[in-house]
Amino acid sequence: LGAVEAMQQQGLDPKSVPIVGIDATADGRQAIKDGTLAMTVFQNAEGQGRASLQAAANLIDGKPIAEGTGYEVDDENEFIIWVPFEPVTIDNVADYD
């Protein structure tokens, strides 16, 4: 949202370029509704937490780290589990309120 504010302070229309954010905060979601933010991404904390707990249990049990998480591991580092970001746009912002 800092980019939106900076553009407004300079008299520029933030709607003239696509500005994106991260975390799908309440302010970010409102900016999408207002048309000043093109999109944000929701980081699924619940999914991250579940995957972390499952990964810890898997390590203790000698199982593959991502087994049972429903997520994939990184191609280059088997200890990174990718919990996908969820894009939030004007089309689905209401789903995140």
Predicted regions span which residues?
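Hinge/cleft segment of the Venus flytrap/periplasmic-binding protein
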Residues: A51-D97
